[in-house]
Each structure stands twice: as structure tokens, then as C-alpha cells.
Amino acid sequence: MSKIQTINDVLNDIRQKATTEKEKGTEFERLMKRWFLTDPRYENLEKVWLWEEFPGKGDLGGSDLGIDLVAKDDTGDYWAIQCKCYAENATIDKAAVDSFLANSSRQFLDDETMQTRQFSNLIFVSTTRNGWGQNALKATQGLEKPFTRINLFELESSSVNWGKLYKGEEGKKALKSGKQPRAHQLQAMSKAHHHFIEEGNDRGKLIMACGTGKTFTALRIMEEMTDDKSLVLFLVPSIALLGQTLNAWMSDKSEPMRAICVCSDAKATRKMKGEDDDDESVVDLAVPATTNVKSILRQIKVAEREKKRTVIMSTYQSIDVVSDALHQAGKYVDLCICDEAHRTTGVKIKDRDESNFTKVHSDEYIPARKRLYMTATPRLYKESIKIKAKENDDILCSMDDENIYGKEFYRLSFNKAVQSGLLTDYKVLVLTVNERDLPYTVSEKIKKRSQAVKKEDLLKELNFDDATKLIGCINGLSKRIKGDGGSTVEEDPVKMRRAVAFCQTINPTKANPNASSTQMANYFEE
């Protein structure tokens, strides 16, 4: 067991030692109980029971009917948790969740208050890489209670020491050691203190290149500028970024903090015709999210009672809920942090509804004592656009407007980050491929496949445009470009070892992996 360091090491050991499926499942449930009592994201859990330990199990039928763990948080809410130790590539089907959903909707008696209770949050933990069947996904949609699914990725990215946890330890002694700020982050922290505290400015811009640790720097700035009575608002443009920030801040914090996630699928992933039918979802956040104002206010009160900073992490799309909560409570935000702040630019047109992304600038809408805008790519507008907006009596939010965004107190450019050794140097290779350059076999296969599938499924198929781009990627990776006379590989003969491809939408990411190896073979055959 001394060599066990990762969750995968633990799972392999459990599978090897278990003589039955029941034994494997029981060991995994015990591990997950310790995990929930250790991972910083679940600090608000006061108790976690194995099913056989739960006092209210008799009211729910007594026997194991899908609920493996029960947790109680510091607001008095109960969580139903199912734990599945499946193979990494397994798919969660509807049968795996049906009994859990059915039994977690039943009532039970709270043995402390002697009141009838229901579960408020539903958590499904599995050791798969998010392999959920369509029917299982549909069964978890539209539920009245928050449903959260935790997969292998979340377990792998947890800040716990899996070796210690597997040995039976839990709590702070089973956590990994935290991060320490690097020189450029310390400089940014010092500049922030000077700008906001010493000079007394209420707005300011932090510009840092991608990959240099903006999120961690913002955490340390927040901890220096606020105390245990403070209320902080952190805004992001997507659920995925909210999840990343939640994980990073709860893992790296050096002082007590309570995170409240505010977002919903309906608000953060509004679908337009022609867009993907599959997107990031609140069910993939590590902790339950809410858009219920009463729930938000209740959590704020608990944090105040426990003398913890309250950090509301919200998408810009759910800013209306945050505004309602602040006004109902009569509270000010001590520090509002706007991540990806370039998204908050744009024109506020007179007599039209304002974008959720620009509402954050208003003190009336979001009462905040200080605002920190951070981005790697500040967005500015040309003078002609500014003049036109002024002529139309519109308000233009441009990041060079210090009345809205404040002064820039720290900048770390991509160039400086590369020179400092913080980022790897890079080159830009522009790949130009025409549809005429597609090999005949490739174009014919795409054409036949497109004719064979249903019209509604065409978006999920690899089309000519995607195939052309894919050929461009193959050219760049292989350096075997037709017609260049071998100049590309001569200039840069070192083989490509790894590549990451970014797609504008999700559907091509599903089609491309299956198509790339086939198209590569067809391409080089010709």
C-alpha cells in the first residue's frame, strides 16, 4: 500500500483484493465517506453516514435500495449519495440511477429534530469518465432537487492525499500540501494592495497571460483584501469555468471560506437553433448549484455564524439572481471579481434590455465596494465606434474606460511570460487547404456518409469543411505537406509528440477523433 498515491492506484488495489462485487462496492463506499469528509469542497458537510449507519434508514425501507451514503450539511439539509465503482470506460445506464432517484424522493424522520425530512441534494459518484447513456441523462433532467454527478476526473483532480485516505485517515491530515505564490504572482498581489488599499481605488484591471495563474493570484488578492466577515462575488462566463474556479479556490485557499454556486442550465446554456445539443451542465459541478434566493441567503447566514468568508461563484447569466439576493439581504459585496472581463464589454443601447455581462458595472445593480476585472485579452473599441455610441446616446463599455474598469494596476504579457520562462515559446503555423486538395477517396466517403444519415444527424457528421480543416491539422502534425517540396520538415525536422485541437462547438469534437485516423490513412495513400 506504500506505493499507492493516486485514485487509480486505490481503485486498482480495491479491484484486485475484492473477492466479490459486493466487497468491492463496500470498500469504495467507505473510501467515499472519508473523501466527502476530507475534500475542501465539502467542508460544509457536518456528518456523513454509510447507509447502514444512517438513523433514518428504517423510514426508507431499511435495505440498500440505491442510496449508499447520507450526508448532512451545516444548513441542516440532507444529501443522498450513490457510489458506483465501475470500469473507467463503463456507461451509466438508466437502470443504475432509477432506484436511487426513486428512493431519494421519499421522506424520513430526523432523529434530532423529530421532523419529517426529505433529501435536498442528490449526488451520483462513479469511477467512469462521464460515460452516461442518453436515457440515464434524461432521467436526471428536470428534477426538483439539484442533481450532481461526480466522475473519475473529479476524483483525480481532488486535493486529497489518496494514499493517506485509503489507509483510513481523513480531514486536514489527509490533504495535499497547498500552493505557494510565485514571484510574478507576489508582484501582482503587491500591486493590487497598493492600488486598492493604499490608493483607495474601487476599480482596477489585472492583465495576465493565459497559463500564468490568474485564478490563484485572484484568490490570494481576495484573501489579503477581505476578512472572515466579508462577502465576495466571483463572476465567470460559463459553468465549466465556474467549476474550475470552485475546484482551484477550495483546494488552494489558506483561510476558511464558504463557496455558494449560483447558476442553472437554463440560464448558462441557452440553446439557439443550429447549436450543439450537448453542453456543459450544472450536474457536472462538484457541489450543488442553485438559483434559489432563499437558499443563497440561508447559506450566507450560516457562513456569517461560522465566521467564514462567503464567496458567491456565479455565471454572468445568473447575475439577476445574485442581485435579488443582495438587495433582499441589504448587503454589499466587499470585492467583486470579474473573470474573463473582456466579456463584460459592449454597447448598452438606450431603451433596450441590458446584457447580463454589462450589468456587473452598475453599483445599483450589484452593490460592491471594490471591483477587480481580470483577463488575458483586454477588449478595446476604436474611436469611431465610441463616437457613434455617443451620438446615439448609448453607453459603450470598453476596457480603456477607467470610469468603468478602473486603472490597470498589473500586466504580464504573453511575450514577457515567455521571456520569463513561465510559458513555453511558440510558433504560429497557418495551414491553408482548399476543398480541391481533399483526396478523392476522402471526399467520396464523406459524400456517401452524408447521403446515408438522417438530415437531423448531419451536424454530428464530419462535413467537407471539417475534413479540410482536419487535413490541415494532419499536414501540420506530419510536416508532410503536398507541394511544399519538403521545406516544412527541412525547416523544423523535430517530430510532433502531442497536439490539442480546439473546436468551436461540441459536435465536431465527437466526429473528429473517429475520423482522423481514417482520413490520415486515406490522405497519405494518395
Q: Residue ranges of each PLM-predicted region?
A:
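Conserved helicase ATPase motor motifs in RecA-like P-loop NTPase domains
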Residues: 209-211, 342-343, 362-389, 421
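ATP-dependent helicase/translocase motor core
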Residues: 3-19, 23, 35, 41-42, ...
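SF2 helicase catalytic motif II
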Residues: 328-373
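Conserved motor-coupling elements within RecA-like helicase/translocase cores
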Residues: 275-310
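Active-site beta-strand-loop-beta-strand hairpin of nuclease catalytic cores
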Residues: 62, 70-81
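Interdomain helical connector at the RecA1-RecA2 junction of SF1/SF2 helicase-like NTPases
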Residues: 383-525
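Conserved Walker A/P-loop ATP-binding site and its immediately adjacent core
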Residues: 230-254, 259-272, 318, 505-507, ...
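Conserved helix/coil segment N-terminal to the catalytic DExD/H
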Residues: 296-332
